[in-house]
Amino acid sequence: LGDVYKRQIIISAIVHVVIGHLYPNEVYLYLAYAGLGTVLGHNFPCYLHFKGGKGIATTAGIIVGFLDPVIIVSCLIAFIVIVAITRYVSLGSITIVTMFCIEYAIFAFHGKYGFDLASAPSYHAMVESVIVVAVICGMAIVRHHANIVRLLHHEENKLGAKKAVS
């Protein structure tokens, strides 16, 4: 988990400093693509025969790397509240990636991330960044398919409970 955050924070710092200086209206587009690469590398590592994780910790690193305190705090609070109430970590995980996708799209379409919405190239970069973030979040949800099925059948393991024997 720590490696995910270190890697994503380094990538975010490089993108903010280098890309932000050269292309200030496209920083979040490049952050989204850097995040997508990180998630793809985590979910489908070639050295594990393309069988990796579900991408939640990596997506959490992306959320932190976007440096938006509103999104970071709201996702953290939602995760804590949902896990505390339901004791389902998977439900909390699915919730935060959904929240991140929705909040990012709303904030981006309202010009929060420096996109010049009056400029066609900047507007297109904003739309593209929203699509990339949606792909990242969609991958995390799809990779939780088995957890979603277990949640619907009330068979998902709860935090702190002994695992059910299958």
Residue ranges and their predicted role:
Residues 39-50, 82-89:
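Transmembrane alpha-helix interface/packing and boundary motifs in multi-pass membrane proteins
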